[in-house]
Amino acid sequence: MKATLIAILTCAAVLVLHTTAAEELEAESQLMEVGMPDTELAAVDEERLFECSVSCEIEKEGNKDCKKKKCKGGWKCKFNMCVKV
């Protein structure tokens, strides 16, 4: 009797954990479909790094103080590059 009860409870616990994991995977897959693909995100990151460093180089060549270009959307300019805050 105890063995049967333990087996039923174990199966129920495994079923609950499996269902929860499946729901999390489904939610993650829906988020990935809605958002930008990783390649597009990488391109945006590269553009931001390039944009900030080039603007500082141009200002230095003009004999002006290098004013760091403001990065928007959770990014800040550090060491002539936009970095995620």
From Swiss-Prot:
Q: From the UniProt record, list the residues forming the propeptide.
A: 23-48
Q: Which residues form the signal peptide?
A: 1-22
Q: Mainly localized where?
A: secreted
- Please report any disulfide bonds recorded for this protein chain, giving both cysteine positions: 52-66, 56-77, 71-82
Alphabetically ordered keywords of this record: Disulfide bond, Neurotoxin, Postsynaptic neurotoxin, Secreted, Signal, Toxin
User: GO: which molecular function terms?
Assistant: toxin activity
- Location of the protein in the cell: Secreted
Q: In which tissues is it expressed?
A: Expressed by the venom gland.
Annotated transmembrane regions: none
Q: Name one GO cellular component term.
A: host cell postsynaptic membrane
Give any Pfam family that matches.
Answer: Toxin_20
Note the subunit structure.
Monomer.
Per its database record, what is this protein's job?
Neurotoxin active on both insects and mammals.
Q: Which family does it belong to?
A: Belongs to the neurotoxin 12 (Hwtx-2) family. 02 (Hwtx-2) subfamily.
| UniProt name for this protein | U4-theraphotoxin-Hhn1a
